[in-house]
Amino acid sequence: MASKQIMFDENARKALLNGVDKVANTVKITLGPKGRYVVLDKSTKPVVTNDGVTIAKEIELHDKFENMGAKLVKEVASKTQDNTGDGTTTATLLAQSMIREGLKNISAGANPIDVKKGIEMATENVVGYLKSKSSEVKGKEKIVQVATVSANNDEEIGNLIADAMERVGYNGVITVEDSKTMETNLDVVEGMQFDRGFVSPYMATDSEKMVCEFEDPYILITDKKINSMKQIVPVLEKVASEGRSLLIIAEDVDGDAQAALILNIIRGALRVCAVKAPGFGNERKEMLEDIAVLTGGQVISEDKGMKLEEFDDYMLGSARKVTIDNNKTIIVEGKGDKAKIKERVSLIEAQINIADVEYKKTELKKRQAKLGGGVAVIKVGAATETELKEKKMRIDDALNATKAAVEEGVVIGGGISLFRAAAILDSLKLEGDREIGVKIVQRAIEEPVRQIAENAGKEGAEVVATIRAEPRELFGYNAKKDVFEDLFEAGVIDPTKVVRSGLQNAASIAGMVLTTEALVTDFNDEKDEKAATIII
């Protein structure tokens, strides 16, 4: 085992804070409608972005102890992104403030465990306050407002997302892809989504977003388990000879078959992704038939006297595009016969009418919605590739935020919902150092307002003082217009889930850092640096 270096107590906490500050200070300049951009140096060309989690993920520090702190605050951003898809910058800022103030108090003699407990109790109270102030999202206007704010106040994006939700429903499938022109527009096409992701992360074509995207793929559908390459060699030979990609939907793909597929993917010999079939039992068979009708393929099943080894071309389906991640698969514009798709939807409708069990009716309605509901495709256009990537990131953020708003409602934006929550913590009286934890949260939840103001070129302390002096709950600073006003009336709103999740994740990581007494890592020597460049 390699020898390790260890750091204790004050020195350990100081190193962690240095790492936290380097990430948070880089990320927080992007907060608000007048936040700045950060340029990331990529291997191909620089990327310009103001997306918090994208920036945080790019930061790797030379000092290994500081890098631990950086990784912890990156975890706040990543976890918030996974939960809600937005609010990563606010979460990072909250974590930095809690960690900085907490370490200051611990250095002065406060008990770390009690401070952590105080932070947890204060966070719980603030979350309760946010939920009590949350308003349900009703109507297109509110959807436009949420999407616009999350897209860095781009009204075009806000309207596009609202239109997309109006056409496919709040829970409908909405995808984002490149446009062949400079225009950004919306199109609704036939498609389907089901809750099954790839069987191995090695199948992702984009390792940053952890998604697999194929244009014009073949689709192999079977209700059998694939555990040997021999079963699918004829299919793979056809796909490879035509230079096409392949999506495999099967009961499972494991053993030698999965290992061989991954090896060929890594070597670049095949472009293949495998997912488990959706549903269970008879429901699975019906869902596979739905996919087959949509894509113009056949379900290869021994029930029909068909075997994978006896594959024929007509058994393969296809689609214009498929997108697969860890949890779901989206098929866009299946190449199936439109008349047969309508016929299949009508058949499901007839089954709904005669179903006598409520559960069965519900499942049939879900299948009908998936097959007949369609997919909204936002096609993003821009003058340059750099602008295109940045715009797609903003649309993804806005889309995720809007879905979060539909789920848990909205609260007043501009950092005001958290700012006003500070007052309710005055009544939370705790003993000893737990009270310090409450004060740390009180200070932290004022930071977003302060930072939004500073990014807009204002004096943060003055803006905070002006808002504090005004008793109206909805009163705040609108950085976009550079005015103080009723923010709810102005349409400055945030999804409750985004604000809540960011606060909880920040408090969780802050508690871990504040109770840390030692750091253990490898020595930062030349051998480590060389190892990073070795390819095996």
UniProtKB/Swiss-Prot annotation:
The reply to whether Mitochondrion figures as a keyword in the UniProt entry is no
Listed PROSITE patterns: CHAPERONINS_CPN60
Q: Name one GO molecular function term.
A: unfolded protein binding
An example GO biological process term is: protein refolding
Location relative to the cell? Cytoplasm
What does the record give as EC number? 5.6.1.7
Q: Which PANTHER family match?
A: 60 KDA HEAT SHOCK PROTEIN, MITOCHONDRIAL (PTHR45633)
Family statement: Belongs to the chaperonin (HSP60) family.
Quaternary structure, per UniProt, is: Forms a cylinder of 14 subunits composed of two heptameric rings stacked back-to-back. Interacts with the co-chaperonin GroES.
Query: What is this protein's name?
Result: Chaperonin GroEL
- What organism is the protein native to? Methanosarcina barkeri (strain Fusaro / DSM 804)
